[in-house]
Structure formats: C-alpha cells, structure tokens
C-alpha cells in the first residue's frame, strides 16, 4: 500500500459552530505536516461586519447562518480563503460526542478558581459527559459577569479535551 507523507499543503481551517439560543464558535486549524490541531475559541460577542453595520458574531449567525459568519470572520481575522465551516445543533454534537464517553478536562487554564467554584467545579481534571459539557458552556455564556474571552477559552478547552483523548475511536 502506497503511503504518502503529509505535505505542507495538507492544511485546513474550519469554523465550528454550535447552534442554539447561545451559539458557540471555535476555529480549528488542522496541520498534517505538524501532526496537530490548533483550536481558537471565538467569543460569540465578537463584533464583525454585517449588513453594512457591526454586529455580534452570534447575531450574524442567527440572522444569516454559518457561511455568513465565516465571511464576516474573514474580514476581521487573517483566515485562509479556503476556510470551511461546519455547523451542528447542540443535540447532534452531543449525540456524536457521547459515543466517545466522558472527556477528562480541566478548566483551570480558562477560568479562575472562584469562577469554577461559582459553578460547583474545581481546578481538578474531571470527567464530564458531552451533555454536561454543553450545559456548562451555555451557563458560562449566559453569565453576564464572565468575560466572553473566558467563555471562549473554556469552549476551546472542551474541544481540545475531546480531540486529545480516545483518538483511536475517532474516524480516520
């Protein structure tokens, strides 16, 4: 069987969108030659150009969907022209992720000890189901006291934990 080694051209940037009352966004950059995935949590309140005005990314998503969000982000961030998007409902994402079991995750890099305690969590790495992770991220996003950057960092931490464990179960 002929095996090709990864090349520098084997790269992909994807905007991952989780729909709902409080949509969530993560940019994933897949780089085969470096054998890595880089994740960037994008705050839903990030201001982007929309309809000749400025609007929050979440408002852009609600009004025009993921393709328009990708276009708006390309005007704000230096994203590649071939950036793709993938949108999930929270139910579909939970169903897909739950097949891999609970993820082991630590939010200490994204949230302070006080912020974690406010939600009954600690700095310790803990097992959490896909449904509980989604509910926790929605709680964070609804918290007006918590900064959008911290919420985005927590979302990226959840995606990162998912990609890092049980890699043998992920489709190839």
Regions found by a protein language model. Give the residues of each.
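Flexible, polar/acidic helix-loop-strand segments at domain edges
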Residues: 98-171
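Envelope-exposed proteins and targeting segments
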Residues: 10-12, 21-26, 36-38, 81-84, ...
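Amphipathic, coiled-coil-like alpha-helical scaffolding segments used for oligomerization/assembly
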Residues: 63-122
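Solvent-exposed coil/turn segments that connect beta secondary-structure elements
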Residues: 19-21, 30-34, 44-47, 90-93, ...
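Second-shell loop/turn segments in exported
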Residues: 54-64, 76-84, 141-150, 166
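Terminal domain-initiation and capping elements
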Residues: 1, 33, 45, 72-76
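Flexible, solvent-exposed short loops/turns enriched in glycine
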Residues: 35-65, 109-120
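Entry/capping segment at the start of metal-dependent catalytic domains
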Residues: 1-41, 138
């Amino acid at each position: 069987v002929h095996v090709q080694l990864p090349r520098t051209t084997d790269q992909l940037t994807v905007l991952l969108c989780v729909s709902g009352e409080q949509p969530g966004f993560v940019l994933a950059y897949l780089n085969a030659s470096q054998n890595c995935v880089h994740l960037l949590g994008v705050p839903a309140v990030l201001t982007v150009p929309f309809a000749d005005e400025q609007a929050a990314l979440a408002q852009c998503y609600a009004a025009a969907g993921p393709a328009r969000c990708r276009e708006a982000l390309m005007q704000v961030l230096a994203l590649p022209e071939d950036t793709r998007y993938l949108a999930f409902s929270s139910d579909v994402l939970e169903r897909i992720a739950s097949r891999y079991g609970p993820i082991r995750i630590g939010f200490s890099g994204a949230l302070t000890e006080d912020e974690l305690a406010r939600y009954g969590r600690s700095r310790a790495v803990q097992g959490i189901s896909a449904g509980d992770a989604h509910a926790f991220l929605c709680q964070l996003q609804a918290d007006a006291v918590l900064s959008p950057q911290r919420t985005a960092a927590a979302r990226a931490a959840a995606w990162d934990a998912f990609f890092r464990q049980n890699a043998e179960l992920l489709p190839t």
